[in-house]
Amino acid sequence: MSSLSPLFITVIVPAAGVGSRMKADRPKQYLVLDGKTVIEHTIENLLAFPMVNTVIVAISDDDPYFDALSIATDKRVIRVSGGEERADSVLSGLEYVQKNTLSQWVMVHDAARPCLRHSDIAKLIEAVIPDHLGGILASPVRDTMKQANSDLSISTTIDRSVLWHALTPQLFTTELLYTALKTGLEQGLSITDESSAIEFMGYQPKLIQGRADNLKITQPEDLDLAEFYLQKMKKEINE
C-alpha cells in the first residue's frame, strides 16, 4: 500500500432509498444495529480507512433522520441531495466531487453494508488503481442458480461458474464514472450499479473477490446476521 499512500479517495454513499422490503417504520439505513444506526456504522468504518478523506452521503431532501445523527456533524461528511434512483444519487455526489476537485478516484458504497472489512478496501485499491479504469468487490455464486418462467416454474439451470454477486465498494475514476452515469441516464438505460454504467460504455471493470460477510441488509433477518458480523469484527480488532 505504500506506493499508493499519497492518494486520497472520496466515497459516495447513496442513501435516499426507503428499503420497503424491510417492512420497518423507517428506511433500513436508520435501523439500530449494535447500539448505532446502520448508516453510522457504515460511514464510521469508511472514515477509519486511511485513504478515505471525505464521505459524501446522498440523502432525500425530506429525510428527517440524518441530521439528528452525531456523524452528521463530522466535517469529513458531506450531505448532497439524493435522487429518485441510485444512479441519480451517485451522480449528485460526483458533481460535488468535480466541483470541489476532491479526488481523482471515487468509491461508491451501499449505506446498508456496515460489515465491510478494511482488508477488502485495500485489496480493491491495490487491484484497481494501477489499471487506471476501475473495478468492484464481488463474491462468487455458491448456490445452484435456476432461471424461472413467469409462473415460477424452472426454465433452466444456469452455469454458476461464470456468475458473481456484485458487492460494494465499487471504485472508478471520477471523470469516467461521471461520464458513464450521465450518459446512461440520458439514454434511459437500466443502471443497477456503477459498474453497469461503465459496462454500457464498452469497458470491462475488474472483479476483485471480496468477503461474503460484506452483506447488504435487505431483509429483516439480515439485521441479526449483520450484528453478529459487526461484533466479530470488533472482537478481532481488540485482540
UniProtKB/Swiss-Prot annotation:
A Pfam cross-reference name: IspD
Pathway as given in its UniProt record: Isoprenoid biosynthesis; isopentenyl diphosphate biosynthesis via DXP pathway; isopentenyl diphosphate from 1-deoxy-D-xylulose 5-phosphate: step 2/6
Site residues by UniProt (Positions MEP for the nucleophilic attack): R160, K216
Domain of life: Bacteria
Keyword RNA-binding tagged: no
The encoding gene: ispD
PANTHER family assigned: 2-C-METHYL-D-ERYTHRITOL 4-PHOSPHATE CYTIDYLYLTRANSFERASE, CHLOROPLASTIC (PTHR32125:SF4)
Site (Transition state stabilizer): residue numbering on this chain: R21, K28
Designated name of the protein: 2-C-methyl-D-erythritol 4-phosphate cytidylyltransferase
Stated family: Belongs to the IspD/TarI cytidylyltransferase family. IspD subfamily.
Keywords: Isoprene biosynthesis, Nucleotidyltransferase, Transferase
A GO term, aspect molecular function: 2-C-methyl-D-erythritol 4-phosphate cytidylyltransferase activity
Enzyme class, UniProt record, top EC level: transferase
Coiled-coil region(s): none
